[in-house]
């Protein structure tokens, strides 16, 4: 785990996940498995994809029993093929069985996001457009999901509400206008913070430019209107395209000339990558 934020938060969140799943005991495992029996199990890819979350997977077992041994044959960012042996985990069989679901949930989810993100990044190659995620993440899993986006080749937008100013339609409504919202943000936020504002029409784009926005989000615009907006902005602000952007329609953004494209689908719609723990046996 390369992110300092992830290192600080991971153990706490993993413990919460284990407590949610195991609570007082794993009655199924404890009913059929005596204590202190050592075993080993294989981690196997059941489909092609990009791996993210190997350290999180390993950490689940280490938090349950520090003596657990994890031998990894792939690492975050690697592309695996169906049938590839990804790791071997050795230790108390009760720990292997009780921690399996939580460990796989993290690994499958994170690898699914990394796989989906990389496929979208490839569609944008050569365009100069930077792919961003959003805050549309699973509660208490943002640190893992945004990390997976980076593994897949995307970039993180704001991690939380303190990371930057993004004035959306309801902020504008509360302030009274785009101009007033930007003026208030400039007066409140530190000067090093960029001011981004959401626009839906060319009239709003023009107002945002005149008010001095640093980044102008072009939200739910057609490709034709976005082209007009980029021409209207004419380099006076950075541009971000947003609104129902998916792998299926992102290719239309390539030639428009925006700087960024943000997609909530990277985290809220990426399917999991099918990964399994198989061949458990005593050693």
Q: Model features per residue range: what roles?
A:
Residues 2-211, 215, 224-232, 238-240, ...:
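Acidic/glycine-rich phosphate/pyrophosphate-binding loops and surrounding catalytic core
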Residues 235-238, 280-283:
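Short acidic, glycine/proline-enriched helix-loop-strand junctions
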Residues 271-280:
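Structured adenosyl-cofactor binding patch, chiefly the S-adenosyl-L-methionine
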Residues 220, 243, 264-265:
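Short secondary-structure boundary segments
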Residues 242-243, 261, 278:
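Cytosolic regulatory modules rich in charged/polar residues
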Residues 247:
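Cys/His-rich Zn2+-binding cysteine-cluster or related metal-binding knuckle/ribbon modules and their
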């Amino acid at each position: 785990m390369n992110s300092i934020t992830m290192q600080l938060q991971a153990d706490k969140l993993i413990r919460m996940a284990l407590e949610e799943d195991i609570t007082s005991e794993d009655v199924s495992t404890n009913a059929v498995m005596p204590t202190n029996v050592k075993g080993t199990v294989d981690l196997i890819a059941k489909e092609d994809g990009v791996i993210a979350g190997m350290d999180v997977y390993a950490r689940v077992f280490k938090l349950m029993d520090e003596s657990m041994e994890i031998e990894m044959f792939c690492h975050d960012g690697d592309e695996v093929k169906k049938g590839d042996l990804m790791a071997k985990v050795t230790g108390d069989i009760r720990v292997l069985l009780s921690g399996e679901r939580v460990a796989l949930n993290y690994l499958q989810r994170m690898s699914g996001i990394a796989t989906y993100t990389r496929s979208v990044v490839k569609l944008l190659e050569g365009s100069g457009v930077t792919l961003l995620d959003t805050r549309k993440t699973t509660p208490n899993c943002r640190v893992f999901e945004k990390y997976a986006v980076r593994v897949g080749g995307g970039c993180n937008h704001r991690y939380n509400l303190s990371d930057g100013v993004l004035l959306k339609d309801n902020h504008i409504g509360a302030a009274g206008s785009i101009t007033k919202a930007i003026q208030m943000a400039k007066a409140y936020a530190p000067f090093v913070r960029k001011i981004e504002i959401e626009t839906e029409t060319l009239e709003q784009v023009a107002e945002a430019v005149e008010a001095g926005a640093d980044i102008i989000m072009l939200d739910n615009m057609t490709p034709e209107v976005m082209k007009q907006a980029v021409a209207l902005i004419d380099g006076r602000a950075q541009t971000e395209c947003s609104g129902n952007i998916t792998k299926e329609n992102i290719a239309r953004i390539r030639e428009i000339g925006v700087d960024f494209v943000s997609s909530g689908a990277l985290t809220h719609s990426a399917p999991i990558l099918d990964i399994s723990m198989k061949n458990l046996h005593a050693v």
